[in-house]
Amino acid sequence: MAKKSKVAKHERQQALVEQYAELRRTLKAEGRYDELRKLPRDSSPSRLHNRCELTGRPHGYMRKFGMSRIRFRELAHQGQLPGVKKASW
């Protein structure tokens, strides 16, 4: 489990990215880079790092499922992920 402060920070960053997304898009399209530079740093989507939705773990993130490899494995073994089964060849 990730620290609660890190998970909270990630949620704040996501909210900022969503809040400034439209403004950022228009400023980029119009080439107004001075105004773009004055926006908060955390409003840039490239500063976001993917985190597991269940545990907040930042490493081993599986984009297709939105969770870390560890939680994915646990849930797959329990049969709680529809359409996922253990490979056999």
Curated annotation (Swiss-Prot):
Transmembrane segments: none annotated. PROSITE patterns: RIBOSOMAL_S14. It comes from the Bacteria. GO terms for cellular component: cytoplasm; small ribosomal subunit. Keywords: Ribonucleoprotein, Ribosomal protein, RNA-binding, rRNA-binding. GO terms for molecular function: rRNA binding; structural constituent of ribosome. The keyword Oxidoreductase does not apply. GO terms for biological process: translation. Binds 16S rRNA, required for the assembly of 30S particles and may also be responsible for determining the conformation of the 16S rRNA at the A site. Part of the 30S ribosomal subunit. Contacts proteins S3 and S10. HAMAP family: Ribosomal_uS14_1. PANTHER family: 30S RIBOSOMAL PROTEIN S14, SMALL RIBOSOMAL SUBUNIT PROTEIN US14M. Belongs to the universal ribosomal protein uS14 family. This is Small ribosomal subunit protein uS14A. It comes from Listeria monocytogenes serovar 1/2a (strain ATCC BAA-679 / EGD-e). The gene is rpsN.
